[in-house]
Amino acid sequence: MSFQRIAWGITGAGHFLDRSYQVFKELKLRNPELSVNTYVSRAAEEVLRMYGLEQKLVKISGGDYLEEIFRESEQGSSSPKVGRFALDRYDALFVTPATSNTVSKIAYGIADSLVTNAVSQAVKGRVPVFVVPVDIEGSIISEMPYNIDRKQCKHCETCPPRENCPHEAISEKNGVTDQIDLLKCKGCGICKELCPYNAIKGGPVEVLVRDVDMRNVEIVKSLQGITVLESPEAILELF
């Protein structure tokens, strides 16, 4: 396939998020002329910050025409920019990672968010859509954002991670460190490096895929104009 102008839809999943970013980074390295227009759901705006990827998106979408970053919080309820899919502006739309919520909406034709609107308009505009669901079958190993392991935490009155967090994302309660506010966290990792007891962690957790999510993936597989891929890396095989 020959794709030169593509759109990337990101939804609010931590699983597959960094791998998706690495795939698009690789595509840009292979072909600097490739234009990538990024559509970010409201939940993805938060999750990108948690995983330290928010500022890195400019390496994929630098800001020129068809290389903008469209955030749902800035696009309003009507998502006017998705009209580009009807105007022959894109060769393909890739949605990765796609949460179970997004997949269920696609399965039943609901288009009430920036990314699901993009999918709907892409299909109507005969633009090929490729979806990478995070919940396909069985169980998955998902990467979690930074959190405090309370078994390891010593509840120090003087807490280097809390005192040095540049985003003031670590709260205290009754004079000791309490928890990380993930809506403030930028995923920089400074806190993890500063904790002398290795109490701040982020890493793999096994998560069960629900039956309903697997059924919705099967429905999406049968839909006109949409192809389901099992991993972000499968996108590389299309170029």
Curated annotation (Swiss-Prot):
Residue intervals of the 4Fe-4S ferredoxin-type domain: 144-175, 176-205
Record-linked SUPFAM superfamilies: Homo-oligomeric flavin-containing Cys decarboxylases, HFCD (SSF52507)
Co-factor: note: Binds 2 [4Fe-4S] clusters.
Keyword Electron transport in annotation: yes
Main enzyme class: oxidoreductase
Pfam families found in the cross-reference section: Fer4, Flavoprotein
Binding-site list for [4Fe-4S] cluster 1: C153, C156, C159, C195
Function text: Involved in the biosynthesis of tetrahydromethanopterin, a coenzyme used in methanogenesis. Catalyzes the reduction of dihydromethanopterin (H(2)MPT) to tetrahydromethanopterin (H(4)MPT). Ferredoxin may serve as an electron donor.
Full protein name: Dihydromethanopterin reductase (acceptor)
Native source organism of the sequence: Methanosarcina mazei (strain ATCC BAA-159 / DSM 3647 / Goe1 / Go1 / JCM 11833 / OCM 88) (Methanosarcina frisia)
Upper taxonomic lineage: Archaea, Methanobacteriati, Methanobacteriota, Stenosarchaea group, Methanomicrobia
